[in-house]
Amino acid sequence: MVTIRLQRGGAKKRPFYQMVVADSRNARDGRFIEKVGFFNPVARGQEEKLRVDVDRIEHWVSKGAQLSDRVAKLVKDASAAA
């Protein structure tokens, strides 16, 4: 099954997450199909906290992809802000 989930990056105590489309059998930080955004939970000042390509997410959901709980919340927040 294809899922849209967060892939952790960044440094110790400074997480940074890529929003990726991946096969659910692959490791969290492993192989992915496409990047569709990012989430920076420790953004300060003018730094961008969230970027989501809603068109690509809708495309993948129409193909049967499942959103993880956290990604679903972030997409909802991004849609409300836009």
Curated annotation (Swiss-Prot):
Signal sequence coordinates: none
GO cellular component: cytoplasm; small ribosomal subunit
Ion transport found in the keyword field: no
GO MF annotation terms: structural constituent of ribosome
Keywords, sorted A to Z: Ribonucleoprotein, Ribosomal protein
GO BP annotations listed: translation
Domain of life: Bacteria
InterPro entries listed in its UniProt record: Ribosomal_bS16 (IPR000307), Ribosomal_bS16_dom_sf (IPR023803)
Pfam families: Ribosomal_S16
Annotated PANTHER family: 30S RIBOSOMAL PROTEIN S16, SMALL RIBOSOMAL SUBUNIT PROTEIN BS16M
Family label: Belongs to the bacterial ribosomal protein bS16 family.
This protein's name: Small ribosomal subunit protein bS16
Source species of the chain: Idiomarina loihiensis (strain ATCC BAA-735 / DSM 15497 / L2-TR)
Top-level taxonomy: Bacteria, Pseudomonadati, Pseudomonadota, Gammaproteobacteria, Alteromonadales
Gene responsible for this protein: rpsP
